[in-house]
């Protein structure tokens, strides 16, 4: 690894030598965000389900019960909810009807995103 400036070297050393506590707290925060997402969806968005996660901060949401086409779902997520999630379509035909959301963010932002998803599905 080539670090050319002193500040970068000091930051790198601090991360390796003193970053364990931050790392562990960040992992716990993301774990709680995953639980928050699962509970929020179960309580507020009954036509959406969350796929159990296997070691990442990217959560798959299943929108099949909404009856929306992949195109309509993408349109509502982008234009109505003003969110940029990963459309399942980019992963192939079997990804249609799914969206992937990053939950490694402040919980207030995650809640706002989930509120927006809930609002675009009202009345279906």
Named regions from a protein language model:
Residues 3-124:
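PLP-dependent class I/II
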């Amino acid at each position: 690894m080539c670090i050319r400036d002193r500040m970068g070297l000091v930051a790198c050393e601090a991360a390796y030598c003193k970053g364990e506590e931050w790392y562990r707290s960040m992992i716990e925060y993301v774990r709680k965000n995953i639980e928050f997402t699962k509970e929020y969806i179960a309580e507020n968005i009954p036509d959406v389900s969350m796929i159990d996660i296997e070691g990442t901060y990217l959560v798959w949401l299943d929108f099949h019960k909404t009856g929306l086409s992949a195109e309509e779902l993408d349109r509502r997520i982008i234009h109505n909810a003003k969110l940029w999630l990963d459309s399942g379509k980019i992963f192939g035909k079997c990804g249609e009807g799914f969206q992937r959301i990053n939950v490694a963010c402040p919980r207030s932002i995650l809640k706002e995103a989930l509120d927006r998803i809930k609002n675009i599905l009202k009345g279906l």
